[in-house]
Amino acid sequence: MTNQQGRLRTRVAVFACVAAAALIVDQLTKAWAMAALSNGQTIRVIPGLLSFTLVRNPGASLGMGSGATWVISLLAVVACVALAVAGVRTVSMKWSVAISFAFAGALGNLIDRVMYADGFLDGKVVDFLNYGWSVGNVADIYLVVAGVVLVILILMGEPFSHKDLIEQSDESLQSEPEADAK
């Protein structure tokens, strides 16, 4: 096994382990919410800021798209496939971890849409974290955090692919003669 293959295996293993652990936490919290809050009960955690309230959301974030559940489900399938491919293709452990959280969030909500479906791709997501202005779940938190981290990685210029590494290497080699000339 080459060093490159070993690093790929490590990144894939980290991607799989982080995604699996995050997905398990998401699904366990949703199972708890359905068991503890199914009778319409609300549990106040931080008054005025956070409470637990069970909601079955057919739409996307903030309830948008509730009339197009099948479109949202189809987009979630495409997103999961794209994120899995990206998680395997990246050369950066930072990208791999961030993408694994996005994958876990997308897959966690897709699992809900399949498990709690009224028809083909017509399911609802289990939301229970009531912030007062929105109700979400742990998968939503993963998606938001992953999105923020991905933007930070882009802004920091963290290489995603071998091509990015080569371009960064070429740029640093080109700037070295300029530094030597000064």
UniProtKB/Swiss-Prot annotation:
Active site: D127, D140
Any Gene Ontology biological process: proteolysis
Domain of life: Bacteria
Location of the protein in the cell: Cell membrane
GO cellular component terms, A-Z: plasma membrane
Transmembrane segments: 12-32, 68-88, 91-111, 135-155
Keywords of this entry: Aspartyl protease, Cell membrane, Hydrolase, Membrane, Protease, Transmembrane, Transmembrane helix
Family matches, as InterPro entries: Peptidase_A8
E.C. number(s) listed in UniProt: 3.4.23.36
Pathway linked to the protein: Protein modification; lipoprotein biosynthesis (signal peptide cleavage)
An annotated Gene Ontology molecular function: aspartic-type endopeptidase activity
Membrane topology type: Multi-pass membrane protein
UniProt xrefs under Pfam families: Peptidase_A8
Keyword set includes tRNA-binding: no
KW Disulfide bond (keyword) present: no
Swiss-Prot/TrEMBL catalytic activity: Release of signal peptides from bacterial membrane prolipoproteins. Hydrolyzes -Xaa-Yaa-Zaa-|-(S,diacylglyceryl)Cys-, in which Xaa is hydrophobic (preferably Leu), and Yaa (Ala or Ser) and Zaa (Gly or Ala) have small, neutral side chains
NCBIfam families (alphabetical): lspA, PRK14771.1
Similarity comment: Belongs to the peptidase A8 family.
Role, per record: This protein specifically catalyzes the removal of signal peptides from prolipoproteins.
Protein name: Lipoprotein signal peptidase
Organism whose genome encodes this protein: Bifidobacterium longum (strain NCC 2705)
The gene coding this protein: lspA
